[in-house]
Amino acid sequence: QPSNAFWNDSKIHRFHLEMSEAEWEAMKALDTRKGVAPADSLKKIDGEQREVHRSRFPWAEGSLTINGEHLNGIGARYKGNASFNLMRGSLKRNMKIKLDWTNKDQNYKSIETLNLNAGGLDPSKLRDVFGYWLFREAGVPAPRTTFADITLTIPGRYEQEYLGLYTIVEQVNKSF
């Protein structure tokens, strides 16, 4: 499988994310606690209260360069709730990237979706990698991981801004 070489936790990949300022601003989370969701929608059908600490993260379009290979028309959004709030004020946040956002045939080594974990609560950046490895060693299906140094360009705002080292986690989907 072409993606096997990518999922190598002894290598640090190089990612560069770029999008317009308008798309960057569109990525801001819509917080359901601030009245976006009507009160009635916070109840389940059985009348119990729903989780009210969830944020919706809009998708934005941009481009991603992975190890020198440029991909246009990718979709990017933040992910997480507690982790998102923990990293408030920082450019380094957990993200989900869909490489086939505008072109359903686009991928990188057969990979269509990437989960970028910032590791805000893990200074070692090894917990996800070790945990998933341990599951696989025990015979339990678990996503593969690798690392990437990520930079960001928002023209007029950030130019090749270093976001940091991320853990990249395989998307659990049909091809998993």
What residue spans do the PLM features occupy?
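Phosphate/dinucleotide-binding and metal-coordinating scaffold of catalytic cores
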Residues: Q1-F176
